[in-house]
Curated annotation (Swiss-Prot):
The lineage of its organism: Bacteria, Bacillati, Bacillota, Clostridia, Eubacteriales. GO terms for cellular component: plasma membrane. Disulfide bonds: none annotated. It is a multi-pass membrane protein. The keyword Transmembrane helix applies. This is UPF0756 membrane protein Dred_1676. The chain crosses the membrane at residues 9-29, 47-67, 75-95, 111-131. It comes from the Bacteria.
Length: 151
């Protein structure tokens, strides 16, 4: 068995043990693609997978606005209040961290395994919520940058 396939099997097992359906499903899908000789899909998934994931994430976030559960009045109040202002600042910082995390994963794709293991530990022991490796990579990039200040 190739190391990529073995890593996917390990991630599948980690996902099952940690009850992280997303990790288990992703590892399973990639194993199926590999074993069914449809590996021509890998470049497409690598190039467009993040965009597709963000598309579905944004769709789920915008549904309350589209269905009027969040009104224009709610939105205006939110952006003009202190919590709303802080959420805007949080969004700015988060997108910057995500950008740095994406750069880190492009420079060193092997870092994803550590991000997933860390996410699983966070889920199991700290009641964390997995939102994907991009934010975890952003935080890791921040830690690496801080460490570089001292070297």
């Amino acid at each position: 068995m190739y190391s990529g396939e073995m890593t996917m099997v390990i991630l599948l097992l980690i996902g099952l043990v940690a009850q992280s359906n997303l990790i288990a499903i992703c590892a399973s899908v990639l194993l199926i693609v590999q074993f069914s000789k449809m590996d021509f899909l890998f470049p497409y998934l690598e190039t467009h997978g993040l965009e597709l994931g963000l598309l579905f994430l944004l769709l789920s976030i915008l549904v309350p606005i589209a269905t009027d559960r969040v009104t224009t009045r709610d939105l205006l109040y939110n952006v003009s209040s202190l919590p709303g202002f802080l959420s805007i600042v949080g969004g700015i910082l988060a997108t910057h961290l995500n950008s740095e995390g994406l750069k880190l994963m492009q420079i060193d794709p092997s870092i994803i395994f550590g991000l997933i293991v860390g996410s699983v530990i966070g889920i199991i022991f700290f009641n964390g919520q997995p939102v994907g490796p991009l934010m975890a990579a952003g935080v890791a990039a921040l830690f690496i940058e801080v460490l570089n200040w001292f070297h």
